[in-house]
Amino acid sequence: TFVSQQISAQTDSIANTHELKNVTVKATNGIKSKYRVDNAEIIGQGQLIRAACCNLGESFTTNPSVDVSYSDAATGAKQIKLLGLSGTYVQMLTENIPNLRGASLPYSLGYVPGPWMQSIQVSKGASSVKNGYESTTGQINIEFLKPQGTDGVRANVYQDSELKTEVNLDGSIHLNDRLSTATLLHFENRQMDHDGNGDGFMDMPKLRQYNLMHRWAYVSPRWISQLMLRGLHDEREGGQSRKHANAASSELLYSTSVKTNRYEMQWKNGFTLNADHNTSIALMLHGSWHDADNMFGATQYDVTQKNGYAQLMFETDITENHNISVGASLNHDYYTEQFNPLGTLPEVESKVTKETTPGLYAQYTYKLGETLTVMPGVRWDHSNLYGSFFTPRLHIKYSPSNIVTLRTSIGKGYRSPHALA
């Protein structure tokens, strides 16, 4: 007997079109991670793109947690305030290496173009002892665009009603799976007199800046190396406007002039010794040469700062809950200052300052899941000018629930004072 069944095939079809609901794209605010032991906020590119043109100082205009104000409106110098204290107590870092300090601090917020930044990390209070002893009220770390990021070329041009012009160009090339390089260019020009209140003084200085950065990155499973070279030329002219109606042709107008040349080199190396225990060793080197010629009316002040910094770090997880980090650092500053209070004196006061500071640090971290983190640390440094000093710091984070996180930090901070630089 033969039995047969009818088999029917079902035909499926896929629609060629599909209508989506409305999608709204918005820039994101700064991100605060509840898992970090320090009180840190990360400002990413989603918030940085809110400003059509910006530099580091202008990027905080949309962030209420950082107060940026003019310390000298005539020259355009700005400062950051954290916890109510001025920027001299805020440590500046570029990719976790101390930078933009000393003679470069007054105008440092204008030295970092906005399109170059990948993110900004703002920490309030005493920071980790890994990065030195200079953080008192907080720390700002700048992460630049990485060569191993998007391959290609990007460009943007900006001009406003005051004829301020900005040109930014960056491009990266992936030579192979491990090696990549990138070049970033920035040009800024503002030459119009701006006197909104009609008092005869320019509200902001005329500015011309050329900025160049070149980077290399090598990334392998056990070794990461990053090299950065950078050059900057910055000119600022301010003071009384020549368009002032009350200024006679024979009247000597008050003017300010700041001409700066700055060069940097930064080399970071990280070696993974044991991936299971996150055991690694890192070597970081940084050098800078900063030269500024300043005229404030009849007062002349010229300064040159040469800085060298080296740091060696070792870090490992002892167990799942215990981590230890130890390291050594060496910082050297060489200042050459020339001061002429009247600009006509036959002899100019000169001063040379040399400071070398080696240091050691140790930091321990205890983590109990996502509930409790305790991170004590201590460092010892010795300055040839001020002797030895200890910097103890303690960070505690406690999260009793998913919506509540409590943090506290206790610590000391130091800085070397310079009357003019």
Language-model regions: role of each:
Residues 111-152:
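A beta-strand signature from Gram-negative outer-membrane beta-barrel systems
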Residues 244-246, 336-339, 384-389, 396-398, ...:
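Surface-exposed extracellular loop regions of Gram-negative outer-membrane beta-barrel proteins
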Residues 151, 178-181, 191, 222-225, ...:
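Repeated loop/turn-to-beta-strand initiation elements of outer-membrane beta-barrel proteins
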